[in-house]
A protein has these predicted regions:
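C-terminal structured "cap/appendage" subdomains that terminate the fold
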Residues: 433-476, 482-486
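C-terminal motif of bacterial Sec signal peptides marking the signal peptidase cleavage site
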Residues: 19-22
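C-terminal substrate/ligand-recognition segments
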Residues: 370-380, 384-427, 442-462
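Short, surface-exposed ligand- or partner-binding patches at beta-edge/loop junctions that are enriched
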Residues: 166-172, 309-323, 459-473
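Active/binding-pocket-proximal capping segment
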Residues: 271-282, 411-439, 472-475, 484-489
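Sec-dependent N-terminal signal peptides
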Residues: 5-16
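Histidine-centered copper-binding motifs that mark active-site loops
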Residues: 31-298, 304, 310, 336-353, ...
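Bacterial signal peptide processing site
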Residues: 24-27
């Protein structure tokens, strides 16, 4: 995916993308990209400009909001604004005035209540990525349209058995997702409790939120249209360029690595230290595993423990990376620096397990579905089972309480990160080879011309939700489908009504064609069951 046209204005990663794709591109020095000529051009790489950034400043965590007595209540005043990114004033979109949205920190069983005031000139909405909550009403309903100028309530009732770990939130209105996330509308959401599963000696280790968030700037503003992932891009950690963190020799730290950007991938390495993965996509792992590198497509999260063996400087870098012949080629960049000094901290044994994996590999499979991701690079259109997203078309209906196996094929010559809302899944096989899952997950890359087999159980929540490619440009340009989870296994009247309301609201906000055939007057298409 090179240039995009916005319509409206874990181990499995490493196994698939290193083995089946490899990496390409020339390594470049860490730091800002050399400024292009600035000559007007239709090629985004020629019009994006770099901006002066402060580098190597002390690390700053995003602002944090914590629940009190079971409730986290806040206001998101969504508006265009000018904020500071790495020492430079940049225009973009914000939830609470900053490029980094506040970190929301809650506990299982809590209620999250957001008063969302949309002060944009376009519609928006809000999504809690990876969260096991209801997809209907004023909850995690991405089919809801929050109109320009409107005031809205967004309420999450977290189950008491929701898994602890790192989630994130972002705008999710089809046709506007890439531009709004790229402009700044994303942040981290943490469900506490992961540390409680660690050995007592590790439960109070430093807890660092490290949100990977990128931007491109032209004329002092974040680019929001004709975004080209190969154009000069500033990669930040919490909005900082190469911030400096400190640690004591042999100290253990918890790093919450989250790719909360719109389109680009990261191939992370921490020179001289290793990643000990304790949770993937906010799912505590049944077996703690160790990696020298981690690949994070858009939307991916890893909670990792890191121990600094000797004094010195350690660079967190993203290495050169290719997503395939028709995909993107990313350069090497330094993201953060860890300065390790002081007396050696005594050794502490690593944990071996933080939670069981649901035994989906032994479950009875009630239904098998074939899902095909495809694209037309010449027209910049993307498809699931031959169709672009249509708010009047339900792709699948699933019955509550059943287990399904999906065989997801990617016919494109670039990787697509598959994501589904509400229910996480377990990877069964990659390109026909059995896969040993250490946890469930909510994002998995589909290799170019490859195949991934997953299983998921629809255990509690009913309602219509979506699955899609988490390269948000691809989602906006068609690569998304709707799944209706019902008690009967038949399309619900409530879903038909809500989709018609969504379609009416979207057409009332803009007249852009949302894909092949998604126009006023369409009748509801019957889904595959």
């Amino acid at each position: 995916m090179r240039k995009t046209v916005v319509l409206a204005g874990g181990p499995v990663v490493a196994a698939m993308l290193v083995i089946f794709m490899g990496c390409s591109g020339d390594a470049t020095k860490a730091g800002p990209v050399a400024s292009p000529s600035g000559t007007p051009s239709t090629d985004q790489r020629d019009v994006v400009t770099t901006f002066p950034t402060e580098q190597h400043q002390p690390f700053e965590a995003p602002p944090e909001l914590k629940s009190t007595n079971g409730l986290l209540e806040t206001t998101f005043d969504v508006h265009p604004t000018t904020f500071n990114v790495a020492g430079a004033e940049v225009r973009g979109y914000a939830y609470q005035g900053q490029f980094m949205g506040p970190t929301l920190r809650v506990l299982p069983g809590d209620v999250v209540r957001v008063h969302l005031r949309n002060r944009l000139k376009e519609p928006t909405n809000l999504h809690s990525h990876g969260m096991y909550v209801s997809p209907i009403g004023i909850s995690d309903n991405v089919l809801r349209v929050m109109k320009a100028g409107s005031n809205n309530e967004f309420v999450l009732h977290l189950p008491r058995d929701v898994e602890p770990g790192t989630y994130w939130y972002h705008t999710h209105l089809h046709g506007h997702v890439e531009e709004q996330v790229f402009a700044g509308l994303s942040g981290v959401l943490i469900v506490d409790g992961l540390q409680d599963r660690l050995p007592p000696q590790l439960q109070d280790v430093p807890d660092q939120v490290m949100a990977l968030k990128d931007l491109q700037v032209k004329d002092g503003a974040i680019v929001r249209s004709n975004i080209d992932s190969n154009a000069p891009t500033t990669r930040t950690v919490n909005g900082q360029v190469d911030p400096v963190l400190t640690a004591q020799t042999n100290q253990t730290q918890l790093l919450r690595l989250a790719n909360i950007g719109a389109d680009i991938w990261y191939r992370l390495r921490l020179g001289g230290a290793q990643f000990h993965v304790i949770a993937e996509d906010a799912n505590p792992v049944a077996e703690v595993w160790t990696a020298d590198e981690l690949v994070l497509p858009p939307g991916k999260r890893y909670d990792v423990l890191v121990r600094w063996p000797t004094p010195g400087s350690y660079a967190l870098e993203t290495l050169t990376y290719s997503t395939g012949p028709d995909g993107d080629n990313y350069p090497q960049r330094r993201l953060a620096t860890f300065e390790v000094t002081g007396d050696t901290v005594p050794d502490v044994a690593w944990p071996t397990s933080l939670g069981p994996v649901s035994p989906l590999d032994t479950d009875h499979v009630d239904r098998t579905r074939n899902v095909v991701f495809s694209e037309n690079p010449k027209t910049n259109r993307f498809y699931i089972n031959g169709k672009q997203f249509d708010p009047t078309h339900v792709t699948f209906v699933a019955k509550l309480g059943t287990t399904e196996e999906w065989v997801i094929k990617n016919t494109a010559r670039e990787a697509h990160p598959f994501h589904i809302h509400v229910n996480d899944f377990e990877v069964m096989a990659v390109n026909g080879k059995p896969y040993h899952a250490r946890s469930e997950q909510d994002v998995v890359p589909l290799p170019p011309r490859g195949e991934v087999r997953i299983r998921m159980h629809f255990k509690h929540f009913v309602g219509a939700t979506v699955f899609h490619c988490h390269i948000l440009a691809h989602e906006d340009n068609g690569m998304m489908g709707i799944i209706d989870i019902t008690r009967s296994g038949r399309l619900s009247k409530a879903t038909i009504k809500s989709l018609k309301e969504m379609n009416k609201a979207m057409l009332g906000q803009h007249s852009t064609d949302m894909g092949d055939g998604a126009h006023t007057g369409h009748t509801m298409e019957m889904p595959s069951r």
